Amino acid sequence: MKQNVFFLIAYFSLVFCMCNAVSHFKNCADKQLSDDKPLQCKIRNLQVDGNMPKVKEYMNCAFESSGWAKDGGKKLDTSKVAQDMVPYGFNIKTELDEVTKECETEFGAEISSIDYLACLLIDEKTKTQFKTMLMMKEADFFKQNLCN
């Protein structure tokens, strides 16, 4: 009985923490894109690339404030990304490492957070898990009605 109570308390604590987590994507959008709702809509729908004005800087802000990237988005911290995925039921550190290495080879020295985002969302090894985690962890941003 005590064990069940402990697990219930732990579960509700985790749910409470996840619901009240800071949305780094929303904070960066509020700081950098508050006057550009059409671009926020495209980001919300993940219909962006690094050639679009403001997107590279925005994604670097979102990834760096999440703790996922360093050095202007040039280095992805797969350990931190993997750690952030665990509460959502995903344990794919090896796959994150593989996709990140392939991405760095493809984009070279000019890589940025938007490139890492694209790689993680395109590769079969990570796309479903990463997108699910992103939508849940950053729900304050991704659940907004930005497209009207």
From Swiss-Prot:
Tissue: Female salivary gland.
Coiled coil: none
Compartments where found: Secreted
Family: Belongs to the PBP/GOBP family.
Gene3D superfamilies: Pheromone/general odorant binding protein domain
Disulfide bond entries: C28-C61, C41-C147, C103-C119
Keywords of this entry: Disulfide bond, Secreted, Signal
Example of a GO cellular component annotation carried by this entry: extracellular region
Chain's role: In contrast to the related D7 salivary proteins that can bind biogenic amines, does not bind serotonin.
Protein's organism: Aedes aegypti
Gene Ontology terms for molecular function: odorant binding
Residues making up the signal peptide according to the UniProt record: 1-21
Protein name stated in the entry: Short form salivary protein D7S1
